[in-house]
Amino acid sequence: MYIRVLEKLTDTALSAHLISIYRDYLPTQGTSLPKVVYIDCKNSFPIRTFHAHLATAPSALSVTSEQIMENVRVVVCLDLTELRKAIQTLSHSLAVERASSKETDPSSTSTTFVILCGLDAMYRATHLVDHLLAHQQLNDSLLRLRILAAEQESGALQTDILLPRAEFPRAASTLLYKEASNSTHPIKKPRSSWYGSGNMLGDYIIKFYTD
């Protein structure tokens, strides 16, 4: 799965999510420690909470917290123009890393996780200036992330977009229905159609860019 839309997480939940990434993608023979690129519209990375979680993480992680922190990069983007530049920089970094690894260890593979927060704020900031530009840059950025993920030589790349549930009401209601259908007290089935005017940001991304 290249791109996922998830409900915005608290600092504690986000830290646990990052820990789970490292737990599930520990370096094995021929792989390197996963890299995390945390992008937000403000410098909100929960470093203290993350450090606290690392201190209590299972020994199965088998790497030090310093090693993990060295592989976490925090990027602040105030609008979609800055996000587009950040993704271009990421693309360049992956290309350089790919060329370097081919020289040192051609069989090695890498995994990069992009955690994208505050996309709704970036979109609004750009939309206030130029609504056409906002739509164009949103599509350019998301398409570029999918292309990078599809390039086998770039290694594995996955993007988690964290948004308030209000930004994907149709997807959220469908998910709630699926969960309720497995319970003893199912709720009334909501509309699950993706069509119609007035798509919210998250529903738009889910419709066109997620797998």
Swiss-Prot record:
Chief place of localization: cytoplasm
Pfam families, per database record: CSM2 (PF16834)
GO terms under biological process: meiotic cell cycle; recombinational repair
GO cellular component: cytoplasm; nucleus; Shu complex
Chain segments annotated as transmembrane: none
Signal peptide: none
Key words of the record: Cytoplasm, DNA damage, DNA repair, Meiosis, Nucleus
Compartment(s) where it occurs, according to its Swiss-Prot or TrEMBL record: Cytoplasm; Nucleus
Family assignment from sequence similarity: Belongs to the CSM2 family.
Main function: Involved in chromosome segregation during meiosis. Promotes efficient recombinational repair and functions in the protection of the genome from spontaneous and induced DNA damage like mutations and gross chromosomal rearrangements (GCRs).
Entry protein name: Chromosome segregation in meiosis protein 2
Lineage, broadest ranks: Eukaryota, Fungi, Dikarya, Ascomycota, Saccharomycotina
GN (gene name): CSM2
